[in-house]
């Protein structure tokens, strides 16, 4: 760039030194000089103090200054263009440093850690079983500070690692241009198909239905970073039958993408609202119609959400945005906890403390300490779980929808906080008995250390399920075992594809 600047300035100076010669050799310069000769010469100075003989010299000086200014402007534009080009190239290649294979030093450091890695839930399910598994994430080459060793992954995202083996070739991904599956503050989710050649028959191409999360604006660097951080969180979380499974990610393209399993029935909140008319308290059997919705289904959903959240405790990961809109449901009634977009530490405090009740932010699901002090812990997730129980057993009602006062719409979060600090809580939903409502109230204790635990909730709803329909519980156990195998096949999908490429 410096060479370009020197050349332009040198060229400009050289041209101005010969400017007089060029003008004299042209018809324009001859006309110009003839006009100058017709001007009466005088040795007297005019009012400005300049002699007439200096007029031509002044003109050349002005022209010289003009051309120098233009040359500097052109150089500045070239410098800006090249700088912007380098910045965009750097943005596209962001994340390359994370695509590294595990080293022996990493394994050594990991094995010496006191962190207990989560294991997949063994089935059949019992209340005393562990949800620990070996997660695929590890710390990056930047050493994690000792004080963060036992901290939730939310607090050390910059030290999390993204593995190369989950990278997807964007050319193998077809993204639907139709109606999106969902959208949020920073990202949009679309249906897609991931192509892969069968490792046994390279001529046969198979396609996997997937959900693809992209930034709303691919040119927004902040949104790109949020998608990339969520991708690393999902890598760290690993696989569990009640957690949305990561298929892979795209980090080399112009935009970052998260590719996850496709869940056909959408979010649980919409499912409950759409199926209210089919709700029945009749005894469930294996012959029960697929479209029906019964109390035992609600108990199953509550049980599964608690199982998924208990698993996150052992990762460890704080979800921060647990709500039925972020819980997906498959056709076989198995749920997946999704949307880890808020699992990262958000830098903008106003994102949570919104002044508008019309903004779809999780104020109604947040614990008082989260609203007031932005303190998010596993205990604040327990509070959110209690609100999920209200949504479940009210068949999708919005929490606090009847307590909003028009004159309290400004600084709404302050009103919600005051409402909770006064000891007021959500009412008992129509389809929750006294025992279930008591569990909900245990989730909403102002003292976070006095709240119930997910393990207690698992034990409670397991007992309720077995009492209501042991046949349903045994069928659920078989389904969860099958889902564990299905998620393992998702991992093998990319392995087969890379095997074919090699």
Swiss-Prot record:
It catalyses: L-tyrosyl-[protein] + ATP = O-phospho-L-tyrosyl-[protein] + ADP + H(+). It is an enzyme of class 2 (transferase). Gene3D superfamilies: Phosphorylase Kinase, domain 1, Transferase(Phosphotransferase) domain 1. Residues 1-19 form the signal peptide. Disruption phenotype: Increased life span and resistance to UV irradiation and high temperatures. Residues 20-58 are extracellular. It is a single-pass type I membrane protein. Disulfide bonds: none annotated. This is Tyrosine-protein kinase receptor old-1. It comes from Caenorhabditis elegans. The lineage of its organism: Eukaryota, Metazoa, Ecdysozoa, Nematoda, Chromadorea.
């Amino acid at each position: 760039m410096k060479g370009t600047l020197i050349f332009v300035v040198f060229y400009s100076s050289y041209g101005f030194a010969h400017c007089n010669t060029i003008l004299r050799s042209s018809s324009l310069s001859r006309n110009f000089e003839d006009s100058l000769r017709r001007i009466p010469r005088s040795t007297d100075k005019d009012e400005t103090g300049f002699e007439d003989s200096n007029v031509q010299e002044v003109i050349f000086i002005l022209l010289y200054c003009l051309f120098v200014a233009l040359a500097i402007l052109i150089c500045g534009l070239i410098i800006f263009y090249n700088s912007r080009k380098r910045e965009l190239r750097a943005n596209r290649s962001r994340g390359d440093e994370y695509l590294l294979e595990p080293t022996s030093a990493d394994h050594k450091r990991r094995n010496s850690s006191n962190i207990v890695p989560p294991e997949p839930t063994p089935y059949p399910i019992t209340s005393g079983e562990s949800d620990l598994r070996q997660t695929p994430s590890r710390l990056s080459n930047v050493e994690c500070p000792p004080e963060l060793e036992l901290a939730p992954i939310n607090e050390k995202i910059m030290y999390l690692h993204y593995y190369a083996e989950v990278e997807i070739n964007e050319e193998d991904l077809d993204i639907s241009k139709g109606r999106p599956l969902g959208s949020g503050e920073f990202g949009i989710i679309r249906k897609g198909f991931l192509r892969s050649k069968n490792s046994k028959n390279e001529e046969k191409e198979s396609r996997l239905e997937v959900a693809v999360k992209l930034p709303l604006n691919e040119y927004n660097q902040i949104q790109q970073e949020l998608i990339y951080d969520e991708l690393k969180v999902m890598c760290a979380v690993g696989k569990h039958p009640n957690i949305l499974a990561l298929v892979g990610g795209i980090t080399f393209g112009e935009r970052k993408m998260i590719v996850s399993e496709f869940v056909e029935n959408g979010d649980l909140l919409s499912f409950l609202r759409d199926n209210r008319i089919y709700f029945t308290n009749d005894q469930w059997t294996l012959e029960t119609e697929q479209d029906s919705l019964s109390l035992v289904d609600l108990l199953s959903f509550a049980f599964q959400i608690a199982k998924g959240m208990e698993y996150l405790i052992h990762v460890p990961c704080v979800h921060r945005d647990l709500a039925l809109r972020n819980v997906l449901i498959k056709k076989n009634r198995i749920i997946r906890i999704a949307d880890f977009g808020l699992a990262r530490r958000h830098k903008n405090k106003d994102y949570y403390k919104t002044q508008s009740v019309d903004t779809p932010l999780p104020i109604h699901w947040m614990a008082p300490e989260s609203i007031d002090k932005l303190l998010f812990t596993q205990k604040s997730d327990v509070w959110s779980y209690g609100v999920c129980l209200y949504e479940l057993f009210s068949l999708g009602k919005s929490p606090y929808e009847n307590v909003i006062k028009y004159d309290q719409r400004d600084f709404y979060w302050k009103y919600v906080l005051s409402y909770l600090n006064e000891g007021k809580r959500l009412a008992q939903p129509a389809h929750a008995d006294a025992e279930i409502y008591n569990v909900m109230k245990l989730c909403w204790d102002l003292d976070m250390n006095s709240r119930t635990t997910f393990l207690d909730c698992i034990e409670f709803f397991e007992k309720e399920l077995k009492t209501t329909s042991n046949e349903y519980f045994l069928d659920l156990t078989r389904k969860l075992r099958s889902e564990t195998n299905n998620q393992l096949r998702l991992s093998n999908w990319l392995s087969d594809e890379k095997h074919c490429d090699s």
